[in-house]
From Swiss-Prot:
Protein name: HPr kinase/phosphorylase
The keyword Metal-binding appears for this protein: yes
SUPFAM superfamilies for the chain: HprK N-terminal domain-like (SSF75138), PEP carboxykinase-like (SSF53795)
Lineage of the species this protein comes from: Bacteria, Bacillati, Bacillota, Bacilli, Bacillales
Residues the entry annotates as binding ATP: 154-161
Family the UniProt entry places it in: Belongs to the HPrK/P family.
Enzyme class: transferase
GO MF entry, a single one: magnesium ion binding
Annotated catalysed reactions: [HPr protein]-L-serine + ATP = [HPr protein]-O-phospho-L-serine + ADP + H(+); [HPr protein]-O-phospho-L-serine + phosphate + H(+) = [HPr protein]-L-serine + diphosphate
Residues the record lists as binding Mg(2+): 161, 203
HAMAP family: HPr_kinase (MF_01249)
C-alpha cells in the first residue's frame, strides 16, 4: 500500500508559489523522481519522463530564452501531457509566458520557489520518497528506547502495551500502540508511526485507553521512529529451547529487509520492561563492537585450552 500525494500537497509542504492552473493542483504525483527537461527543449522527445515533476533551473530557463517564441511554445506544449503533474521553477526566476500559456491550456500547475535548484530538488525528492514509500500495518507496539526504535510484537494479551507503559514510566518514548504503520523509505530504512486517530494513545486491559502525552508530557511520545530491532514476546513454552548465551542472532523480514529479532519468553515474575531495556542497550553495545556472549565464549575457550595444556 502506498499513500497518494497531489501537486497541492507538494505546494503546501514546500510553500511554493502558484503561477497558474489552480484547478490542476489535484493532479497526482506517482513517482519521486524528477526531470530536468534540458534535452526536451532541443526537441529530443524519444525518451521523455512525462510522469515526473518537471524542474526548471537557471540552465533550462537561460537556454529557452535563446529560442524563438514560436519554437519555445511548441516545445512547452510537447511537454504538457495528461500525465505531467507540474512544472516547478527555482530561484524565483521569471517564468516564460509561453510555458504559462501551454500549462494553462493543459491545466498543469506551474509553481515557483525561492530555493536554489539543487537544494529544491533534494527537498522535493525527500518529501516525495517519504510520502510515496510503500506502507504496511503491523500489530505491535513501537517504543524509542535509548535512541533505538524497538518494535514489540506478540499475540494479543501477552503484555505488549503494559510493557510499553512501564518503559514510558522509565523515561522512554511511545511511538505507536496496537497498530504500527511501517513505511520503507529506502532499501535500508523502515520508519514506524501511529495512525492519526490513535496517536499517543495506549490501551491497557482493565484500565482502558490512556493518553500518554497528557499523562506523562510531550517528552514521553514521538511521532515516528526508525525501526532498529524487533522484540517478540511469547508465552513460555517449557518444551522449547530459548537462547541462553546470545550467540545466535534471529532475523525477521519486514518488506525485503532482515531486521534483528529477540524472542523473550513471558511468564510470571519476569520484568519484561527491564529485559527489553537491557536488550536495547546490549544491541547498541554490539554495534559499537563489544559482544558479551562472544567475549564469554572466547574466555571460556582460552580457559579450557589453558587447563588442557596444564594437564599435558
Amino acid at each position: 500500500m502506498t499513500k497518494s500525494v497531489t501537486v497541492k500537497d507538494l505546494k503546501e509542504r514546500l510553500n511554493l508559489e502558484l503561477i497558474c492552473s489552480e484547478t490542476g493542483l489535484e493532479r497526482p504525483i506517482l513517482t519521486s523522481d524528477l526531470s530536468r527537461p534540458g534535452l526536451e527543449l532541443t526537441g529530443f522527445f524519444s525518451y521523455y519522463p512525462e510522469d515526473r515533476v518537471q524542474l526548471f533551473g537557471m540552465t533550462e530557463i537561460s537556454f529557452s530564452e535563446g529560442m524563438e517564441p514560436e519554437e519555445r511554445l511548441k516545445r512547452y506544449k510537447q511537454m504538457c501531457t495528461k500525465r505531467t503533474p507540474a512544472f516547478v521553477i527555482s530561484r524565483n526566476l521569471e517564468v516564460p509566458k509561453e510555458l504559462v500559456a501551454a500549462a494553462k491550456e493543459a491545466d498543469i500547475p506551474v509553481l515557483r520557489s525561492r530555493l536554489k535548484t539543487t537544494r529544491l530538488s533534494v527537498y522535493i525528492t525527500n518529501y516525495l520518497e517519504s510520502r510515496l514509500a510503500p506502507v504496511i500495518s503491523m500489530h505491535g507496539v513501537l517504543v524509542d528506547i535509548y535512541g533505538l526504535g524497538v518494535l514489540i510484537t506478540g499475540s494479543s494479551g501477552v503484555g505488549k502495551s503494559e510493557t510499553a507503559l512501564e518503559l514510558v514510566k522509565r523515561g522512554h518514548r511511545l511511538v505507536a500502540d496496537d497498530n504500527v504503520e511501517i513505511r520503507q523509505e529506502d532499501e535500508l530504512t523502515l520508519i514506524g508511526s501511529s495512525p492519526a486517530i490513535i496517536e499517543h494513545l495506549l490501551e491497557i486491559r482493565g484500565l482502558g485507553i490512556i493518553n500518554v502525552m497528557t499523562l506523562f508530557g510531550a517528552g514521553a511520545v514521538r511521532s515516528s521512529k526508525k525501526i532498529t530491532i524487533v522484540v517478540h514476546l511469547e508465552n513460555w513454552d517449557p518444551d522449547k529451547h530459548y537462547d541462553r548465551v546470545g550467540l545466535d542472532q534471529e532475523k525477521t523480514k519486514i518488506f525485503d529487509m532482515d531486521i534483528p529479532k529477540i524472542t523473550v519468553p513471558v511468564r510470571p515474575g519476569r520484568n519484561l520492561s527491564v529485559i527489553i531495556e537491557v536488550a536495547a542497550m546490549n544491541f547498541r553495545l554490539k554495534n559499537m563492537g563489544y559482544n558479551a556472549a562472544e567475549q564469554f565464549t572466547q574466555d571460556l575457550n582460552n580457559l579450557i585450552g589453558h587447563n588442557s595444556s596444564m594437564n599435558d
